[in-house]
Amino acid sequence: MYHDGEDYALARCDLSTGQFAACAFQGEGAQAKLLNQLSAWLPSEAILSPGAESQEEVTAFLRDRLDCLCQPGQDGPFRTDRARKALISCGLWLEEEPLPPEGSRKLLGFRAAGALADYLAQTQKTDLSHLGPLVLEEEPEGQYMELDLTARRNLELTETLRNQEKRGSLLWVLDRTRTAMGHRMIRAWIERPLRAPGRITRRQDAVGTP
């Protein structure tokens, strides 16, 4: 996690599947959006830049609400040049590929992703060639419904409130996918509900039925 001024950036990786994604939030309301995103991702471990570690509300949320292990990081891996080097080394970025525009949310996410790649390269004693592709998320504001941790738990989107199990949750009811990739996709859809009617309709039209 990276923090600078009013801006935040997050990157996440699932080592078992190779999924690697990053997103960023800028300006007013950025911290609230960050907490909502953390509620969706439910990280078990977080690497914090010095700026992020200084945000007591964020670190308390990670430790107390999400039971997440917080590890202090250095500013160096979050620099654009070092982030690019780490991503190229892990096969997540092509050497000839241009950087995201300066000042953009994508560049913030790029820096967070690079710092995570740098951390994994140093700590994981295994081949990382299965990681990727890197997804730099930059959706228009208001595209998704904002749900905080309490709302997510009360709605039992992906696990039940009582037993923290999939069975009985909305995901359990809707998931008729036949592949691991399909399961991950429908889970991601449920965790980030769309708001635009047109996009909702297109998504419904794209779903096949048995």
Language-model-derived ranges and their functions:
Residues 1-210:
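Charged catalytic and DNA/RNA-contacting regions of genome-maintenance
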